[in-house]
Structures are given as structure tokens and as C-alpha cells.
């Protein structure tokens, strides 16, 4: 099949993070600081990505501001002609630090928020962070950069959807993404504590719809549904190895940020193989491209080019088979697995297991 060049690179510069969010989708086993790619290696990755056709670079983590070479990496990506987006907790994003990044070509900031007020947000983040995030947002707007606010929704903050929208308005956000938790990595460990109730989901959707209509043309609102409760799966990555690739802190190259969960796939790394060769020719990137890998019901389903069989990582985590129909799909023979999870986990009083920093020091 014909393979197009990727549009975007998610550069996960580090797994280190000042927050301890229970919904973190990074792997349970994090990359230690000593095993992160060096500055020179990241510069080579950026060069190779641009040669491959990448136009957007999203610098993320962990917390990318913990890399002292961040201005150099932003500058290289910008000099190559890429649109550079910083995905950050905001901790450490002072006006002077931001000015240095803007001077090097930073074009956009995505800022995570955990709740609509400091008490709730700081409890979820496991750190006193909320007020510092608001200061970071003020700095972004003062610098003239577009601001996106990202909120991961779960049982502990779903009742704040309306207040979160109002908060994003006050922050001057251009875009608000309200994304229900995806259960990968550390978040999977906390699924029973994170899964919202049906009542919470039903209450949130009309609030989001009304706000999206009211704010049309002023603030874009993107609502990512809780796919466990949907009839069909989300079109994960708009197809495996189709639009974007991820380079993890240690150089592993992934078709999606959570793909390391599929332990049956070989792991490619930029230290052993070129980015171009990985994108076009590796087993891991070609495993689920197109629809030739599909089995029924996906193979003969009219939605196979709409949702692409759903999420490969979710299929593997719930069934042990990455080629299975995503079990959140109502047509999946494994839908009962998801129904049982909803029945047993969506309304139990389970405490968070907070993410700790020790593994990445």
C-alpha cells in the first residue's frame, strides 16, 4: 500500500514531571534521566523528521521544561520550518523562560489543567500547581501566543465541566480540549478510580454542546468522549502509522503514544535504525496499516475506514490480541469485557494510586 509522509512528530523529551497525576498515560515503567536521548540525538531526530516530511513538532513529556536544552530543540525545529507546540504542565514556564522559547520560534502552548479550583486540581495533581498554571497562562497570553487548555476528565472532576469551561474562558484560551481518560499506562492502574458514571457523562454532554455553540468563533471546544460507554470506537490516530509518530524519551519510535503497551510488537529505536526506515519499512509501523490485517467483524464493516477497527493498544490490553476488534465496539465479540468493567468499576469508591517520581530520577 502507498504510505504518506507523517504530518506530526510527538517528541516526548523526558518522562520526568513535577506532577503525580493518577490518569497519566505514560508507561508504568518510565525512562530514567540517564537513558534519555542527548541534545545531539534529539537534534538529529528533528532533522530526520523534517526530512521525512514532518511539519508539526509537539514537544511533550513528562514535563519538557525540565530539559535545559529545550530552547535549542525549539530553535532547531523552528529553523527547519516546523510549527512548534509546547505541551506543558506550566510549572516553570515563567515570563522570562517563555520569552526565550518564543525568541527561538515557539508558536503555541498547550497547558494542562486538573480541575476548576485549586483545592480540587492540586489534589488530583498531587502538587500545589493550580495557581502557578494560571500564572503560566497569563504569561502565554501576554507573549501573544495561542493557548490551548487540556483537561483530562474522570470521576473526580467530571462534575466540574461547566466550571472548567468558564475557567478556560477567563484564561483567554483559544481552544479547550475536554478529553475523557484513556486507560493506558498508569491510568489503566487507576481505571476503577477514574471511570466516570453514566450519570456524569449524561450530565456533561449538553453542557459542552451549549458552551461550544455559545463560544463559536471565540473558543473552540473539543470533547473527546468516553469510548467505553460509546457504541463505536474512536478513530484512533486516524489510522495506525498514518499521520503521526512518537519518539519516546529513550529514542523508541512508536506509531502512537501508547503503543509500547503492545508487547508482541518489536520496538524500534532511532539509535539503531533511521526514522525514515522505521516509518516506511518497520514491522511495527506496518502491522496495522490499511485494512488487510482486519478480521471480521471489522473486515466487512462499512465503518472500517471511519474508525479503523478502533484502538490497537486498547484491543491488546483488554483481549491480549492487538488485531482484535476494539472491545468498546458494540459489534465486537469481546464487548462483554467492557460491559463487565463498566458494571464493576464505574461507581466504586476507589482511591487514586498517585504517580511517583522515583523511577525517573
Model-derived regions, located:
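Radical SAM enzyme [4Fe-4S]-AdoMet core and its adjacent flexible, acidic
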Residues: 37, 83, 99, 103-104, ...
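Short strand-loop junctions, especially beta-strand C-caps/beta-turns
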Residues: 27, 62, 152-154, 316
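Flexible loop residues that form catalytic
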Residues: 29, 62, 114, 181, ...
Amino acid at each position: 500500500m502507498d504510505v504518506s509522509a507523517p504530518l506530526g512528530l510527538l517528541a516526548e523529551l523526558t518522562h520526568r514531571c513535577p506532577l503525580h497525576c493518577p490518569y497519566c498515560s505514560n508507561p508504568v515503567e518510565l525512562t530514567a534521566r540517564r537513558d534519555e536521548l542527548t541534545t545531539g540525538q534529539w537534534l538529529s531526530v528533528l532533522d530526520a523528521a523534517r526530512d521525512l516530511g514532518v511539519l508539526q513538532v509537539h514537544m511533550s513529556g513528562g514535563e519538557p521544561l525540565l530539559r535545559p536544552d529545550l530552547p535549542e530543540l525549539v530553535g532547531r525545529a523552528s529553523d527547519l520550518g516546523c510549527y512548534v507546540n509546547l505541551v506543558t504542565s506550566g510549572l516553570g514556564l515563567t515570563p522570562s523562560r517563555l520569552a526565550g522559547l518564543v525568541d527561538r520560534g515557539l508558536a503555541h502552548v498547550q497547558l494542562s489543567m486538573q480541575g476548576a479550583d485549586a483545592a480540587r486540581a492540586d489534589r488530583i495533581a498531587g502538587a500545589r500547581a493550580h495557581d502557578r498554571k494560571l500564572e503560566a497562562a497569563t504569561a502565554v497570553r501576554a507573549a501573544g501566543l495561542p493557548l490551548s487548555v487540556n483537561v483530562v476528565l474522570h470521576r473526580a472532576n467530571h462534575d466540574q465541566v461547566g466550571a472548567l469551561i468558564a475557567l478556560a474562558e477567563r484564561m483567554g484560551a483559544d481552544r479547550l480540549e475536554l478529553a475523557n481518560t484513556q486507560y493506558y499506562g498508569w491510568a489503566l492502574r487507576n481505571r476503577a478510580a477514574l471511570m466516570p458514571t453514566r450519570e456524569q457523562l449524561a450530565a456533561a454532554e449538553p453542557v459542552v454542546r451549549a458552551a461550544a455553540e455559545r463560544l463559536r468563533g471565540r473558543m473552540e471546544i473539543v470533547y473527546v468522549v468516553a469510548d467505553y460507554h460509546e457504541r463505536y470506537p474512536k478513530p484512533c490516530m486516524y489510522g495506525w502509522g498514518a499521520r503521526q509518530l512518537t519518539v519516546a524519551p529513550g529514542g523508541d519510535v512508536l506509531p502512537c503514544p501508547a503503543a509500547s503497551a503492545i508487547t508482541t510488537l518489536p520496538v524500534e529505536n532511532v539509535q539503531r535504525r533511521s526514522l525514515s526506515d522505521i516509518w516506511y519499512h518497520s514491522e511495527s509501523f506496518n502491522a496495522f496499516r490499511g485494512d488487510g490485517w482486519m478480521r471480521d467483524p471489522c473486515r466487512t464493516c462499512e465503518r472500517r475506514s471511519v474508525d479503523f477497527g478502533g484502538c490497537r493498544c486498547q484491543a491488546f490490553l483488554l483481549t491480549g490480541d492487538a488485531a482484535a476488534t476494539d472491545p468498546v465496539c458494540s459489534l465486537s465479540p469481546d464487548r462483554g469485557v467492557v460491559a463487565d468493567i463498566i458494571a464493576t468499576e464505574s461507581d466504586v469508591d476507589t482511591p487514586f494510586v498517585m504517580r511517583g517520581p522515583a523511577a525517573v530520577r
